[in-house]
């Protein structure tokens, strides 16, 4: 008679899982409501929540309240310094380059207090949920074997070295800037000392420290999930929270597409195509298709668990409905990249998951699959009949016409300029966060980017090719940690393609599609996208490492 292995016994959710899960849920709920990486205090608040999640995954209950006291002290010191800086100053503010007049976007109080107050909220939340009096004995062993953990630390150390060894300083006022050379150690990686935060006239400040803040919050969320050892059911619950948040945001964003006014205090540019709180529809489309991929993975998870009862209904149908709705809203953002991704998810990834992931259970889940397909077709026909895809069709036609006329896409000149910039410093790069300050010299040489007088028409702040821009900023040496993380991901991708991981295969494909999309657009500099991406990567790792196939093999005959 079969005897169940010990790891096949369902145990209660631990208090540490509750603590880290609560902070992660808060980050996922708040993620889409900040204007990406533009508003400094939103980025700082995300990083604060991420740090509190790591402490919740590592420390005991007493440690949470001790760290809460640290965050209170930090907030008091920051408030005192801000008040002192504002008193009688011609250019008030805690941080450099603060404009004389404030809006919500660049308010010095928000910027000074966002990180400690967000960390305080996360720590108090962890203190309420956590019941373990001592530090976790498993956190360090888990992180010690985590390639993304070490890759993130190595990348942060490299960027810090660049910033400490600055070859120049950016002096900026009212959209004009120049780089003042500085003495530095020539044989070490060098960076550019530039504004950390934005003012009213130019919301495009960026440097290495700000880049680390943008990447650091989502990275800390992933580290916390791994250190706490969150099991699949907790990650499934977080995925449901993210999908539900995205669905609510999709409806609200579709109904709120202003062409003027402000978002978090920043004036909406005249040429911007806003969707909700996203200044760019492409970013909204990416956020929605990431959650559509999560919903597809949830449908696969619940379908496998339902087995031959799938035709009777269940959460898999709700998840499939959510995936279709989010995919349609992603298309309604008029993002060509989002349309291609959701099309591949539906027409390629979903069938591949059925035939590859359910190889041993295909007969059991077939009735449930047909029920989901019929429901999906009905949803697509119903929503497609009332939705207006005319703007999307016009945009696609315009891009196709420009490609036929020029023989290339409209962002090819930016890629060419970025490539020349990267080749001038291929080993160490120009410094993290330096692209917008250095690249205009190279952009000005591209005929397609010039005006009628042969001058640069508009300065591009990003290359719209994230991997090429990263190469230009950090060089080949700075890409080594990224390559290590990609090797780790390759192993997870290979594991996801094995039989018994139907819920992991959509996540792996989603990450591949996101990486390809980042080769043609600006994606990896926005915290809402990276926060969801951190959950996708953590879920992929858990689904491949905590497989049902492996647990079934552990059952003794």
Language-model regions, residue ranges each:
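Membrane-helix interface linkers and caps
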Residues: 130-145
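Alpha-helical transmembrane segments of multi-pass inner-membrane proteins
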Residues: 2-59, 64-88, 107-131, 147-169, ...
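Perimembrane loop-to-helix junctions flanking transmembrane segments
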Residues: 93-103
């Amino acid at each position: 008679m079969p005897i169940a292995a010990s790891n096949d016994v369902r145990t209660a959710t631990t208090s540490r899982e509750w603590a880290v899960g609560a902070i992660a849920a808060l980050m996922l709920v708040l993620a889409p409501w900040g204007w990406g990486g533009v508003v400094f205090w939103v980025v700082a608040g995300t990083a604060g929540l991420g740090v509190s999640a790591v402490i919740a995954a590592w420390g005991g209950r007493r440690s949470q309240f001790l760290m809460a006291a640290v965050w209170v002290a930090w907030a008091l010191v920051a408030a005192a310094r801000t008040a002192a800086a504002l008193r009688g100053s011609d250019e008030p503010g805690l941080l450099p380059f603060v404009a004389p007049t404030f809006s919500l976007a660049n308010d010095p109080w928000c910027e000074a207090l966002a990180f400690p107050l967000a960390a305080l909220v996360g720590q108090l939340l962890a203190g309420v949920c956590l019941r373990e009096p001592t530090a976790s004995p498993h956190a360090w062993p888990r992180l010690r074997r985590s390639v993304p953990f070490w890759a993130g630390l190595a990348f942060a150390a490299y960027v810090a070295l660049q910033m400490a060894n600055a070859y120049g300083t950016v002096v900026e006022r009212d959209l004009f800037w120049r780089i003042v050379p500085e003495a530095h150690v020539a044989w070490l990686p060098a960076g550019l000392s530039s504004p950390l935060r934005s003012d009213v006239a130019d919301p495009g400040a960026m440097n290495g420290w700000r880049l680390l803040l943008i990447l650091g919050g989502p990275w800390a969320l992933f580290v916390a999930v791994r250190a706490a050892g969150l099991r699949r059911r907790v990650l499934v619950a977080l995925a449901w929270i993210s999908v539900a948040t995205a669905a609510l945001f999709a409806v609200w964003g579709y109904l709120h597409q202003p062409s003027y006014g402000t978002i978090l205090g920043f004036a909406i540019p005249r040429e911007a195509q806003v969707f909700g709180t996203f200044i760019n529809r492409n970013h909204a489309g990416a956020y929605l298709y990431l959650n559509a991929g999560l919903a597809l993975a949830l449908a696969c998870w619940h379908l496998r668990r339902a087995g031959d009862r799938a035709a009777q209904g269940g959460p898999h149908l709700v998840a499939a409905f959510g995936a279709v709705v989010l995919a349609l809203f992603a298309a309604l953002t008029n993002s060509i990249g989002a349309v291609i991704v959701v099309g591949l998810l539906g027409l390629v990834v979903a069938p591949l998951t059925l035939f590859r992931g359910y190889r041993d259970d295909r007969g059991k889940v077939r009735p449930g699959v047909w029920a989901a397909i019929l429901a999906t077709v009905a949803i697509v026909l119903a929503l497609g009949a009332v939705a207006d895809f005319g703007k999307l069709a016009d945009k696609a036609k315009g891009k196709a016409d420009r490609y036929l006329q020029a023989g290339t896409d409209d962002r090819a000149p930016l890629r060419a300029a970025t490539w020349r910039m990267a080749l001038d410093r291929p080993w160490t790069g120009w410094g993290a966060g330096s692209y917008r300050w250095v690249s205009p010299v190279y952009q000005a040489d591209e005929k397609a980017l010039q005006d009628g007088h042969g001058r640069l028409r508009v300065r591009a702040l990003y290359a719209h090719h994230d991997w090429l821009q990263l190469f230009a900023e950090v060089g080949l040496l700075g890409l080594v940690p990224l390559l290590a993380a990609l090797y780790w991901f390759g192993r997870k991708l290979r594991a996801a393609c094995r039989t018994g991981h139907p819920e992991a295969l959509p996540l792996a494909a989603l990450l591949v599609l996101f990486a390809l999309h980042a080769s043609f657009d600006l994606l990896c500099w926005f915290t809402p996208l990276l926060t969801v991406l951190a959950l996708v990567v953590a879920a992929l790792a858990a689904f491949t490492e905590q497989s049902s196939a492996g647990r079934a093999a552990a059952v003794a005959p």
